[in-house]
Every structure is written in structure tokens, then in C-alpha cells.
């Protein structure tokens, strides 16, 4: 499938300046300043003066990092170049999460595959410790040849997952019908590269080929426009936190979901024989 670049349509939704008293921006962030390596020893490396980070996985261990700061609402962008070649069995996770048994979490997970087969991007949203809201997509480009931008926009109304500024998923605030929404717990940014060959590729049928190790993923151009620590829901009229998708972005979202979605928990009647989750019963097409 040919890669198509759509960088302009969605960006206009997020250009309004953030309130200086409660917001912070990190443009082209420095990995030394913004993140800590949390595990993996020498398998996680920061170089190019803090502008590039790599995570590696070998048979002994994977590796990971997390942000120094916590955030509540905002837009997070990171460019990744995923594990090349036979990446079957590996998972590169990039997500936001709070801590504790009732944690909130917003997930991108990239499931490796055999050479020539497409990567799968696995998304999930946890609220108050409960997940089971998976949607999965094939990527419509080779994510190992070049860097691509993976973004989360999180505001009191919705969570938007984007790839190269194209929305692939929207999780709307459905508190009005009793569905918890992540809005009170600040989250850190995490990423890790690890072995998950018990489930990641074809349900665990394809195992990691350790003769191809080490497996390496690369990160650059971290950018955050977020609340740090605490933030109110009132951002002022016209602020980006209250924006909705425009018509072009809705078309792009429908295009992705029609052509590349391979799993949607909101249509899995076998998994939920007693009824789909409440948010799936709403008429919105963009859950």
C-alpha cells in the first residue's frame, strides 16, 4: 500500500496559544532534559546532544524511558522509526500513564511482524484501572524506513490518536452515560521495547528470532503542549482543548477506519456477549 502524506488538514485545530500560567511547551525537546532511562542499562542510549534516543532489545532484556514531568491534558508528539526487518514478537510501546490500581492510560503499541508483513498499531484507553478498549490498525506505510509522527491530543472532551497528523481514533468523553474519562490524574510519557512473543504476532504463533537481535527503535523531535501537574478544565474560549475534528479530519478518520482497522472492541459481540460497553452504544462513528 502506498504511503500518502496528509500533514495540513488537522493542524489548524491546534494552533491557538496555550494559557501561559498553566501550560508549558517543549519544542524539539532534549531527551537529556525531558526523560529518564528507567531500565535496560546500555540498551537505551541518548545521543546527538540529546536530540536522538534509541531503545534496544536482546535476548537478555529490553529497555525503556519515561518523562521527568507529569502532564494533565495537552498534545504530545513523538517521531519514531520502528524496528526494521523481522520484528516478529517485539512490541514498541509509547503511551501516557498515571500510577496505581485505578490508573488512567492512553496507549500506542506497535506489534512487530515478519519481514514484508505490515506492522500493527494497537491502541487502548484505560480509565480508573479498566482498559479493554482496543482498536487495531495496519499501518499504510513502512514505519521502519523513515521517522513518522505519533501524537495524542487529550482534552476534557476527547482523546485523539494521530499518525502524521491524520486522526486514526477518537475516544470521546461519555461521562454523561456513566463511562469514566481520564481527567483527574496527571500522566507521564513512557516508552519501552520488549519481547511479547507469547501474544504479539499472530496470537503468539510467531516467535522472536533472536538471531536478528539486537532489535532497535529510534526516537526524535519530542514536542509537548501540555498542562504540568494540575490544570483546570476551563481553558478560555477558542482554546484548542475544546476543538472538534473539522470536515477534512473526519474524512481522514473515516478513510483510516474503513481501510486499515482490523479490530474494534465496539463490534466484538463474542467478547461482550452480555452487551457492548456503554460508549459503544452511542451513535458516534468515531469511538
Curated annotation (Swiss-Prot):
Boundaries of every GH16 domain copy: 29-219
Any Gene Ontology biological process: cell wall organization
Example of a GO MF term: xyloglucan:xyloglucosyl transferase activity
PROSITE patterns: GH16_1, GH16_2
Signal sequence annotation: 1-28
Sites where a glycan is attached: 113
Active-site residues from the entry: 105 (nucleophile), 109 (proton donor)
UniProt catalytic activity: breaks a beta-(1->4) bond in the backbone of a xyloglucan and transfers the xyloglucanyl segment on to O-4 of the non-reducing terminal glucose residue of an acceptor, which can be a xyloglucan or an oligosaccharide of xyloglucan
Residues with site note (Important for catalytic activity): 107
Induction note: In fruits, expression is decreased by gibberellic acid (GA3) or 1-methylcyclopropene (1-MCP) at the beginning of storage (until day 6). Expression in harvested fruits is increased by low (0 degrees Celsius) temperature treatment, particularly at the end of storage (day 32).
UniProt EC number: 2.4.1.207
Disulfides per UniProt: 227-231, 266-280
SUPFAM superfamilies hit by this protein: Concanavalin A-like lectins/glucanases
UniProt PTM: Contains at least one intrachain disulfide bond essential for its enzymatic activity.
Similarity comment: Belongs to the glycosyl hydrolase 16 family. XTH group 2 subfamily.
Function summary: Catalyzes xyloglucan endotransglycosylation (XET). Cleaves and religates xyloglucan polymers. Does not catalyze xyloglucan endohydrolysis (XEH). Overexpression in Arabidopsis transgenic plants results in elevated tolerance to abiotic stress, such as salt, ABA (abscisic acid) and drought stresses, and in the production of wider leaves. Overexpression in transgenic tomato plants slows down fruit ripening and softening, and the plants produce larger fruits. Both transgenic plants have larger and more irregular cells.
Name of the protein in question: Xyloglucan endotransglucosylase protein 1
Organism in which the protein naturally occurs: Diospyros kaki
Gene that this sequence comes from: XTH1
Amino acid at each position: 500500500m502506498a504511503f500518502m502524506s496528509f500533514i495540513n488538514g488537522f493542524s489548524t485545530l491546534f494552533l491557538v496559544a496555550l494559557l501561559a500560567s498553566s501550560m508549558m511547551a517543549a519544542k524539539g525537546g532534549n531527551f537529556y532534559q525531558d526523560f529518564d532511562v528507567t531500565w535496560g542499562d546500555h540498551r537505551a542510549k541518548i545521543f546527538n546532544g540529546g536530540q536522538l534516543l534509541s531503545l534496544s532489545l536482546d535476548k537478555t532484556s529490553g529497555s525503556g524511558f519515561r518523562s521527568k514531568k507529569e502532564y494533565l491534558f495537552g498534545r504530545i508528539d513523538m517521531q519514531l522509526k520502528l524496528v526494521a526487518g523481522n520484528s516478529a514478537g517485539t512490541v514498541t510501546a509509547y503511551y501516557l500513564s498515571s500510577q496505581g490500581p485505578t490508573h488512567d492510560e492512553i496507549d500506542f503499541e506497535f506489534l512487530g511482524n515478519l519481514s514484508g508483513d505490515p506492522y500493527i498499531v494497537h491502541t487502548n484507553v484505560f480509565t480508573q484501572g479498566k482498559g479493554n478498549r482496543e482498536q487495531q490498525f495496519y499501518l499504510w506505510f513502512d514505519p521502519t524506513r523513515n521517522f513518522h509522527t505519533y501524537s495524542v491530543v487529550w482534552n476534557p472532551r476527547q482523546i485523539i490518536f494521530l499518525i502524521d497528523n491524520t486522526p486514526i481514533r477518537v475516544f470521546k468523553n461519555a461521562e454523561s452515560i456513566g463511562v469514566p474519562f481520564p481527567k483527574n490524574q496527571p500522566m507521564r510519557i513512557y516508552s519501552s521495547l520488549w519481547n511479547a512473543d507469547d501474544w504479539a504476532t499472530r496470537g503468539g504463533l510467531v516467535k522472536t528470532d533472536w538471531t536478528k537481535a539486537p532489535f532497535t527503535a529510534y526516537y526524535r523531535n519530542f514536542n509537548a503542549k501540555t498542562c504540568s501537574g494540575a490544570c483546570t478544565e476551563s481553558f478560555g474560549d477558542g482554546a484548542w482543548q475544546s476543538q472538534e475534528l473539522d470536515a477534512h479530519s473526519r474524512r481522514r478518520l473515516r478513510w483510516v477506519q474503513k481501510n486499515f482497522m482490523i479490530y474494534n472492541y465496539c463490534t466484538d459481540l463474542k467478547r461482550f456477549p452480555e452487551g457492548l460497553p456503554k460508549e459503544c452504544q452511542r451513535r458516534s462513528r468515531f469511538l
